[in-house]
């Protein structure tokens, strides 16, 4: 009887020791995952700051684009402004919305840094980022088509290129379109990071 009791005591002790080892091993495995998620969240925050700069640059550059030629006739004054074209007006509105959204998304990005396993904030960001990348690309593509016509014209439609006369105007709108496409690419990278972070959840 005594030997049986001793064997039982030894088995119980070994079981507790194995359980403690399993818990310690599990914590050691989970810690690198938390560190990876936090690193992804920090990179996401940096991308959002960069996207804010790109979207704001696109908005302000396009929104302040205006050029008046130094010569005019008795009845005409040659002027080019962004609000003369609906595509450019849509471009300014879309990038302004994207800029505002990026500012509002910063607190949620910080939450993902502080709490790497918070799935709700990350899921909200990936949904809104997807909407914003669609809006930004649509605006940039529409404006890019107008910029192409301004540079090259269209002989079939008898549309002449205007960039030889309005060179400052064309340079400004071209730069704004490039900045908007950069913002769209940054949005795509943020979506990839969010999807990867959710996959590792």
UniProtKB/Swiss-Prot annotation:
It comes from the Eukaryota. The chain crosses the membrane at residues 39-59, 90-110, 130-150, 176-196. Keywords: Cell membrane, Cell wall biogenesis/degradation, Membrane, Transmembrane, Transmembrane helix. It is found in: Cell membrane. Its main location: membrane. This is Casparian strip membrane protein 2. Regulates membrane-cell wall junctions and localized cell wall deposition. Required for establishment of the Casparian strip membrane domain (CSD) and the subsequent formation of Casparian strips, a cell wall modification of the root endodermis that determines an apoplastic barrier between the intraorganismal apoplasm and the extraorganismal apoplasm and prevents lateral diffusion. NCBIfam families: A_tha_TIGR01569. The lineage of its organism: Eukaryota, Viridiplantae, Streptophyta, Embryophyta, Tracheophyta. It comes from Vitis vinifera.
């Amino acid at each position: 009887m005594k030997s049986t009791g001793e064997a039982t005591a030894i088995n119980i002790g070994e079981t507790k020791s194995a359980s403690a080892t399993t818990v310690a091993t599990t914590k050691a495995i989970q810690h690198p995952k938390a560190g990876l998620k936090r690193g992804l969240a920090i990179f996401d925050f940096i991308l959002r700051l960069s996207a804010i700069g790109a979207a704001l640059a696109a908005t302000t550059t396009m929104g302040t684009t205006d050029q008046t030629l130094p010569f005019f006739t008795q009845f005409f004054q040659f002027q080019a402004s962004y609000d003369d074209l609906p595509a450019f007006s849509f471009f300014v509105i879309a990038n302004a919305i994207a800029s505002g959204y990026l500012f509002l998304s910063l607190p949620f990005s910080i939450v993902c840094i502080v709490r790497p396993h918070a799935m709700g904030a990350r899921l909200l960001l990936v949904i809104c980022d997807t909407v914003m990348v669609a809006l930004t690309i649509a605006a940039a593509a529409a404006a890019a088509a107008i910029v192409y016509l301004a540079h090259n014209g269209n002989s079939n439609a008898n549309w002449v290129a205007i960039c030889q006369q309005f060179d400052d105007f064309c340079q400004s709108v071209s730069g704004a379109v490039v900045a908007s496409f950069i913002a769209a690419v940054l949005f795509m990278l943020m979506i990839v990071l969010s999807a990867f972070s959710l996959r590792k959840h």
